[in-house]
From Swiss-Prot:
Protein name (Swiss-Prot/TrEMBL): Ribosomal RNA small subunit methyltransferase H
A molecular-function term among this protein's GO annotations: rRNA (cytosine-N4-)-methyltransferase activity
A Pfam match: Methyltransf_5
GO biological process, one term: rRNA base methylation
Catalysed conversion reaction: cytidine(1402) in 16S rRNA + S-adenosyl-L-methionine = N(4)-methylcytidine(1402) in 16S rRNA + S-adenosyl-L-homocysteine + H(+)
Protein residues bound to S-adenosyl-L-methionine: G42, G43, H44, D62, F86, D108, Q115
The UniProt record lists the keyword rRNA processing: yes
């Protein structure tokens, strides 16, 4: 998620990645019910609200307390915000008795620019701050706490699995040895240690490690899988799913999810079956509507958009 909305927070000024395209892919209906699963600073939510009619409804979700504070600036009666992880979206929808009535769900994955740019959140190796990295600072272990408790093998696994870090074992050993003598509590301490321990100089050596630790601390990939399953459960017939991912691990999950639910049962070629008959066999429930990537102009304006991929799917009607 790279979400920077000019009208919400004066401290962060740039535009949400693929803003128009992601919302257009929802195929907004005047009286529809929509979910913005990753409110951030409200860029997508505001655009959705601008396209809804008086009877429309938008439910936003975010687990970041700062996003919840930003959402309080929206006083539109069609809008509501839920403080919690987007992986629980099906639970929220069940509580509202709206299962099967959601016309569109937008998910903008990963960490937002306000989170990256705020040194106190501890997400960035470019800014010195507390070594935290939690999306919701009130829950779970901080990055510093986890690195103090974890074994070298566990740290290496995280760096390799979620950061595709080729020097994972070397870096993990250096982290554990440093924490035994002088525990790290600041992002700069970790970034400097990784830079000194890594022979890789193509880009900042800490890039992959910070990504990996952040993904692990926040259970990001598991959260995505649960959110997608929840979206599949609650979407109305012909309801749309619009998902923006920012690295290959995220996009692979989204792509495989859409592919899995778009694949019908294996039946002999030429056998005349209707969509309803195929569904009764436990088959196809989604169809892919395509994918998009940012153009050169958007990347030039917002370099963080470079790796983003937007994928669309539609719930097959009953």
């Amino acid at each position: 998620m790279v979400d920077n909305n000019k009208t919400v927070d004066n401290n962060y000024k740039h535009t949400s990645v693929l803003l128009d395209e992601a919302v257009k892919g929802l195929n907004i209906r005047d009286n529809g019910i929509y979910i913005d699963g990753t409110f951030g600073r409200g860029g997508h939510s505001r655009l959705i609200l601008s396209q809804l009619g008086p009877e429309g409804r938008l439910i936003a979700i975010d687990r970041d307390p700062e996003a919840i504070e930003a959402a309080k600036q929206i006083t539109d009666p069609r809008f509501s915000i839920v403080h919690g992880p987007f992986s629980d979206l099906a639970h929220y929808v069940r509580d509202l008795d709206l299962v099967g009535r959601i016309d569109g769900i937008l998910l903008d994955l990963g960490v937002s620019s306000p989170q990256l740019d705020d040194a106190e959140r501890g997400f960035s190796f470019m800014r010195d701050g507390p070594l935290d990295m939690r999306m919701d600072p009130s829950r779970g272990l901080s990055a510093a706490e986890w690195l103090m408790k974890a074994s070298a093998d566990d740290i290496a696994w995280v760096l390799k699995t979620f950061g595709e870090e080729r020097f994972a074992k070397r870096l993990a050993k250096a982290i554990v040895e440093r924490n035994l003598t002088q525990p790290m509590t600041r992002t700069k301490e970790l970034a400097d240690l990784i830079a000194n321990a890594s022979p890789f100089r193509d880009k900042h050596p800490a890039t992959r490690s910070f990504q990996a630790i952040r993904i692990y601390i926040n259970s990001e990939l598991e959260e995505i899988e649960r959110a997608l399953d929840g979206a599949h459960e609650v979407l109305a017939p012909e309801g749309r799913l619009s998902v923006i991912s920012f690295h290959s691990l995220e996009d692979r999950i989204v792509k495989n999810f859409i592919r899995h639910h778009s694949r019908g049962p294996q039946v002999p070629a030429g056998l005349p079956l209707t969509e309803a008959q195929l569904r009764s066999m436990g088959g196809r429930t989604l169809k892919s509507v395509g994918k998009m990537m940012p153009g050169d102009a958007e990347i030039a304006e917002n370099p963080r958009a470079r790796s983003s991929v937007l994928r669309f799917a539609e719930r097959i009607g009953e």
